[in-house]
Amino acid sequence: MFIDTHCHLSIEDYDNIDYVIKNNLEAGVKKIIVSACNKRTLNAALDLSSKYDCVYVTLGYHPEEASLVTNEDLEILKKLLKTCKVVGVGEIGLDYHYGKENIELQKQLFEKQLSIAEELKLPVVIHSRDAVNDTIEILKKYD
């Protein structure tokens, strides 16, 4: 059995999700894990998991969202993570590729989401680009 462990089907780029899902199933992909990583895609991913038996989700805020995420957003995320067919927190982490102007915000958001994952006993999907050392240092603080 094949499982697609990381895709972004909840973004608006797909005109025909039914076709994409059908093709995956015909190719032998039995389960699809959709990673929602911003405010726009959280509910869209959950909707997909409700519509398709083969779709599961991970929910979280990508590091590029660090300056946009509020404490209220994190509370909403925490509630959504308790939803059926949620299998993890992600895609979360650090991304220094395009600049380092919001590093501290990224680190704070990453740690807050790791704390939520730890509390809810959920695995995480890590995004780390040009930030390996900081990512590892932060991860060492968590189980």
Placement of each model-derived feature along the sequence:
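Mid-domain alpha/beta scaffold segments of enzyme catalytic cores
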Residues: 1-143
